[in-house]
Amino acid sequence: SIKVCGLCHGHYGYRNIARTIGLDPDGITWQAPGLNHNIWLTHFYYEGQDAYPLLDAWIKDNIEAYWEDRKSGDIPAQMSPSAIHQYKMYGLMPVGDTPRRGGWWYHTDLETRKRWYGGAIGGGDTPEGRDRVLKSKEERFQQMKEAAYDSEIRPIDLFGDRKTTEQHIPIMDGLVNDNEGQFQVNVRNDGALPGIPDDVAVEVPAIVNKKGIQPLRVYPLPRKIMLECIYPDWLQMERTLEALKSGDKSMLLYGILDSHQTRSYDQATEVLEALLAMEPNEPMAYVEDINKHYKWPSNW
């Protein structure tokens, strides 16, 4: 009975693609359905014309120079070697966080990450990259506290007066004030994305107004993307959920064994026990003890 809508701003990667190849993002018509952090640019039009040929021509003529110019700095994940490689593998551009998700072969070590995500540090998911992200978030958090508690500081001076592209407030505005708009949302599937069960959360476009959040039914994703990207993520989610609901400790172990970072069964058991031995942080300290919830099967 709880009304829930998940949001992610990764879909704005289509604007990064457009700007990079010299197109005005405001002239783009697009669609990128899938699962959270696993969405694919099925529709990419510029002023009514298919923009994929423009992207192909730009990649052919410019991508190597684009990467070379940024080898000592940062390459946006959206236009990284990983993203372009996935485009070549699947025939559709991965959007937003999808290039970061990729396959295990993009993430085996730091040098591999530098190959696929470029720049001086190999993207934002390396130790140095994460430190940058966390530092930025901490700085913004401190700004928010100052704006909230310091009467001498005006939020508008810190954050500006221009409307951002984030969807939270416009969606609320649509639901409450009937200012209709189309948004990218994560909701129960209920037939919106073909091939996925109704009770699984999918990321699709939706019309939002006083009547609620109404997902649009999208075209099926290519079968290869479904088999190699969508279904594996869906099944991993189902295994994780079943482990939580059943309390089966062996299912947690399987999740570690299934990782390409795992090198042996014994290593997997050591990792599991180390994770379960960690002190819980807030608010997990107030829920059920994880070691009481998860048990080995009775015949273990």
Question: Which residue stretches match the model-derived regions?
Answer:
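Short, acidic/small-residue loops that bind anionic groups at enzyme active sites
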Residues: 1-11, 30-32
